[in-house]
UniProtKB/Swiss-Prot annotation:
InterPro entries cross-referenced by the UniProt entry: Globin-like_sf, Phycobilisome_asu/bsu, Phycobilisome_asu/bsu_sf
Spans through the membrane: none
Protein's name according to its UniProt entry: Phycocyanin PC645 beta subunit
Lineage top rank: taxon: Eukaryota
PTM entry text: Contains two phycocyanobilin chromophores, one mesobiliverdin chromophore and one 15,16-dihydrobiliverdin chromophore with binding mediated by both the alpha and beta subunits.
UniProt lineage: Eukaryota, Cryptophyceae, Pyrenomonadales, Chroomonadaceae, Chroomonas
Length: 177
């Protein structure tokens, strides 16, 4: 897992150069907007159980066959597994948002995700829809457009953070396709 600092240092080291110029300015911006980033992650993790349950509920409302006797969310065990998987995805997205780097998401969550679901017979479309619902909800929390939040959300313009967060969810959706 690389954070914004490690990524810059690794890049400079591979070129046998000092960190400076544009890289230093990018790190300065990363630090100056650190409180917004922390607030954005806090808004997500403080509402994680609601985000996950709403996403899974939305997926099921759009495809009620998932809770029929032959569906992938039928029985408490399968529903619990679905909620657990969505929670894991959200957790790794929050780690990526906190560090400003998607490598933890890619390395620990996305590798083999599609193949795992395919081997279990889980339809990718439903998973992608649940991820899309989580994406919309998290972007709403970060942009302060959601009315269903437990804590305050980041102050100021957080559109860049919202876009970054959306990009992490897009990576998950792409991994499922």
């Amino acid at each position: 897992m690389l954070d914004a600092f490690s990524r810059v240092v690794t890049s400079a080291d591979s070129k046998a150069a000092y960190v400076g110029g544009a890289d230093l300015q990018a790190l300065k911006k990363f630090v100056s907007e650190g409180n917004k980033r922390l607030d954005a992650v806090n808004a997500i993790v403080s509402n994680a159980s609601c985000i996950v349950s709403d996403a899974v509920s939305g997926m099921i409302c759009e495809n009620p066959a998932l809770i029929s006797p032959s569906g992938n969310c039928y029985t408490n065990r399968r529903m619990a597994a679905c909620l657990r998987d969505a929670e894991i995805i959200l957790r790794y997205v929050s780690y990526s948002l906190l560090s400003g780097d998607s490598s933890v998401l890619e390395d620990r969550c996305l590798g083999g995700l599609k193949e795992t679901y395919a081997s279990l017979g889980v339809p990718a479309a439903g998973n992608a829809r649940a991820v899309g619902i989580m994406k919309a909800t998290c972007v709403g929390f970060i942009n302060n457009t959601s009315n269903q939040k437990k804590l305050s959300t980041p102050a100021g313009d957080c559109s860049a953070l919202a876009s970054e967060c959306a990009g992490y969810f897009d990576k998950v959706t792409s991994a499922l396709a």
